[in-house]
Amino acid sequence: MELRARGWWLLCAAAALVACARGDPASKSRSCGEVRQIYGAKGFSLSDVPQAEISGEHLRICPQGYTCCTSEMEENLANRSHAELETALRDSSRVLQAMLATQLRSFDDHFQHLLNDSERTLQATFPGAFGELYTQNARAFRDLYSELRLYYRGANLHLEETLAEFWARLLERLFKQLHPQLLLPDDYLDCLGKQAEALRPFGEAPRELRLRATRAFVAARSFVQGLGVASDVVRKVAQVPLGPECSRAVMKLVYCAHCLGVPGARPCPDYCRNVLKGCLANQADLDAEWRNLLDSMVLITDKFWGTSGVESVIGSVHTWLAEAINALQDNRDTLTAKVIQGCGNPKVNPQGPGPEEKRRRGKLAPRERPPSGTLEKLVSEAKAQLRDVQDFWISLPGTLCSEKMALSTASDDRCWNGMARGRYLPEVMGDGLANQINNPEVEVDITKPDMTIRQQIMQLKIMTNRLRSAYNGNDVDFQDASDDGSGSGSGDGCLDDLCSRKVSRKSSSSRTPLTHALPGLSEQEGQKTSAASCPQPPTFLLPLLLFLALTVARPRWR
């Protein structure tokens, strides 16, 4: 009797497994017409699509219930979902890059316009104001403006040294022009140069220009370079490829509902966020240094105003040059006496010119600002836009989910949760790599950060430090901050606080079914999801169970 009961029990178990594996005959004949339409609309061949649902043991990503997807269809849709997410990421990055590039062009054009206007004013007014004192030294003034442009553009020049060399050369040339009756050999001019700091032949103009120009040019070029570095970081991060675990999770998020016969089910919002937080975990780690950079850029715009501000200084370089030449002419006799006292009497030039030409004093044009409100408007727009994108990296998963993934607007128990239509129960993960340790949708190795992104984090830090130095008026050595560096980080790509954590992760196939609860379904919906909700036994177990059942029951049948 006991053997007979055990035999019947095994027969029932085998029958149940067979029924679960093969499904309801009614569901097996369900049409795949809707899936055919969607699949064909994406440009794939309809010959791949079965006319009716088939058994899904072949599926490697989607749940293995009855399905309208062949292996080739699943692979095609997985590749398509991967490409669509990468396209969405690039599109979001392009929008941010375009904004930063527009800001960079606007500020660069304005700063260049200020300097160009100053040089044009000098070229228009100095010949009439100073005569040969300018025309015979026009190249020296052109060279000064060229070097100021190079410095602004980020060339590795020291501005104070550049200005000091300009004043030294100009003093030698002008002193010779003001004393054509004297022979002034090189050693005498060297002596003149050594005493220049004490004699202050150009008055206060060189000192004022040095102090104000350093602050103004450092602020202007650091702000513009900050925009360039930010744009370059966005471009390089957009090129970071998505990992294979991310690709699987995105396929399951976007297209597995189609394969399981519920193409109308849209992803649950929290489900989508967990998938993309896992996919973009490394990108979210940019957040802290990204915010620091943008904050520093907003802060340095305070240096655009005032008597030492960008607008007051860069557009008025010519006025300090005019003041300097006037001071030299006014102090000519006193200066000459002090030079002779310190360097000795120079020899008279027997071929020198006749009577001294009448001095020409240049009239100083007022230091006019550009059209009122130009820079104020630029700064106001830049501040608003930079603040708008401060949370770009941590808000990216939510933005992509809401704008690109067609999230469900139905009640929580009607959205696609990765297994079927139903409520999505897992909590939403935090931002960044370390917070993905328990991500239920994407398996993330938190001990292996992406090195491209780590390098970009370092570039953000470097640029932020330069902006802070510029805010304090310090001349910093600007190298190309966009160069890829490999000196940051350890060789194995680990962070100290992450590598010490040994993590044992379960694969996605071992997640408990309790994370995706199935609500009460209508009879029709229950037929659609019954196959998906039933676990699939290996095919070879079915005949084995039947054999065992027959063996156990055999004594009673004899």
UniProtKB/Swiss-Prot annotation:
Residues annotated as glycosylated: 79, 116, 486, 488, 490
Segments for region (Disordered): 341-374, 505-534
Gene Ontology molecular function, alphabetical: copper ion binding; fibroblast growth factor binding; laminin binding
Disulfide bonds: 32-68, 62-256, 69-259, 191-343, 246-279, 268-415, 272-401
InterPro entries: Glypican (IPR001863), Glypican_CS (IPR019803)
Biological function: Cell surface proteoglycan that bears heparan sulfate. Binds, via the heparan sulfate side chains, alpha-4 (V) collagen and participates in Schwann cell myelination. May act as a catalyst in increasing the rate of conversion of prion protein PRPN(C) to PRNP(Sc) via associating (via the heparan sulfate side chains) with both forms of PRPN, targeting them to lipid rafts and facilitating their interaction. Required for proper skeletal muscle differentiation by sequestering FGF2 in lipid rafts preventing its binding to receptors (FGFRs) and inhibiting the FGF-mediated signaling.
Protein name as catalogued: Glypican-1
Provenance organism: Homo sapiens
